[in-house]
């Protein structure tokens, strides 16, 4: 919040964009929820990649990706869920903003990026659907056949395409 407040001293909020990847996607959503709670002006746009406003292991994709990729679901599944519940209520909208439609209805224009082999696919799609239903401008891009970390490899054409989509989205929405 302090960094955002510092940015607001030098920039109009409509000139600020926030981007987060993986856990940073959730942090981006949490930031928007927190800014609303603190009555701060919202940024002009946000982009959330491979993480969004819902718990990443909710839905079909977390379970199926664990099976396909021989992923130890216990790291993020039942034990992981219990661990996160010990830290915060998973239905707390400051932890997972998707549980509060009022917060979600006030999101700035949002870009959501994921892939078909991303364990957080369901969370990202659910966030996008919720935003659209609530009347928030939201774009969803899904890349075929790459995993959760595809954006980390700049050699992949999909990574370059996703990066271009992010730049284009911010160019469109930030003044």
Label the predicted regions.
Residues 1-175:
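Alpha/beta-hydrolase superfamily serine-hydrolase fold, recognizing
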């Amino acid at each position: 919040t302090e960094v955002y407040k510092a940015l607001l001293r030098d920039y109009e909020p409509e000139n600020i964009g926030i981007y987060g990847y993986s856990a940073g996607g959730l942090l981006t959503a949490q930031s928007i929820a927190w800014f609303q709670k603190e009555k701060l002006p919202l940024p002009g746009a946000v982009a959330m990649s491979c993480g969004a406003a819902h718990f990443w292991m909710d839905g079909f994709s977390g379970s199926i990706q664990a099976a396909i990729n021989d992923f130890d679901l216990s790291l993020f599944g039942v034990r992981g869920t219990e661990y996160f519940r010990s830290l915060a209520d998973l239905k707390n909208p400051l932890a997972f903003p998707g549980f509060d439609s009022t917060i979600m209805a006030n999101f700035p224009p949002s870009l959501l990026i994921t892939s078909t082999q991303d364990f957080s696919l369901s969370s990202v799609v659910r966030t996008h659907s919720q935003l659209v239903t609530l009347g928030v401008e939201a774009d969803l891009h899904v890349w075929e056949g790459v995993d959760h970390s595809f954006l980390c490899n700049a050699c992949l054409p999909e990574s370059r395409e996703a990066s271009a989509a992010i730049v284009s989205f911010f160019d469109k929405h930030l003044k």
